[in-house]
Amino acid sequence: MLVLGIESTAHTLGVGIAKDQPPYILANERDTFVPKEGGMKPGDLLKHHAEVSGTILRRALEKANISINDINYIAVALGPGIGPALRVGATLARALSLKYNKKLVPVNHGIGHIEIGYLTTEAKDPLILYLSGGNTIITTFYKGRFRIFGETLDIALGNMMDVFVREVNLAPPYIINGKHAIDICSEKGSKLLKLPYVVKGQDMSFSGLLTAALRLVGKEKLEDICYSIREIAFDMLLEATERALALTSKKELMIVGGVAASVSLRKKLEELGKEWDVQIKIVPPEFAGDNGAMIAYAGMLAASKGVFIDVDKSYIRPRWRVDEVDIPWRN
């Protein structure tokens, strides 16, 4: 089985190709929109994705050394995400499905992150941290679905850090030589400032932390503010994670999503793993951020269980939660 996956939920237009036997991932091509200033504007995302989609599709097919006719199914991330960006991927998927008579497979973006994590880390039964620009979720698989034990009550961890570095003119670009701008700034910081620390059970709130940190700009050294906001945010996440570990008794902790690439977070998680006797499984950097390969792979799993959608019913779902998705391919 060969499945072509299309990702366009936010700043990345990605096309991946997966097959149902090793090495599983045959291609993982993408192009990421980087705004010259400010945040991501939906109209700019739509224009970018529409302009690069054809090129990325061709590159993926060339990388896999196959033609579109060799593909069995078309998988597409229908949500969650930014509406105009989602529509580009959905439109491309529908066009390919109709033109080449290929069945369409609906994929939840978060499930894509989680399933590529299972594949690349070889985790068996983990507690999962799904950390990205749009999501901060603590979950695990139980009785047919991924059940959420904790999540952000407002903005996501990744988004909070992106907004801060943008507001203080440290970004864009957000990632420099594999490091987030807040990590680079934090390297010269050492003073832990007083900032809000909000954990409610296994849920977290980052909006107050962001607001308070921005109010300190000009009053404290920027390096100390970066250091403090990062340390406090990560410690909040770790406290909520420890509670979930105590509740579930899991012996594996899998981290997926763009924030999984953070070296500083990795160090904290390794310490937590030693303390709790838990194996830490972190998705490789090339699959941490948004990508088409994860959509192709999750789509392959879904297709293997007959999960398809009619083209005329393939609506985008900007607020589609991972705990709303049935997972028939997992026992």
Swiss-Prot record:
Record carries keyword Iron: yes
Cofactor(s) listed: Fe(2+)
GO molecular function: iron ion binding; N(6)-L-threonylcarbamoyladenine synthase activity
EC code(s) of this entry: 2.3.1.234
Keywords: Acyltransferase, Cytoplasm, Iron, Metal-binding, Transferase, tRNA processing
Assigned protein family: Belongs to the KAE1 / TsaD family.
Stated name of the protein: tRNA N6-adenosine threonylcarbamoyltransferase
Organism: Saccharolobus islandicus (strain M.14.25 / Kamchatka #1)
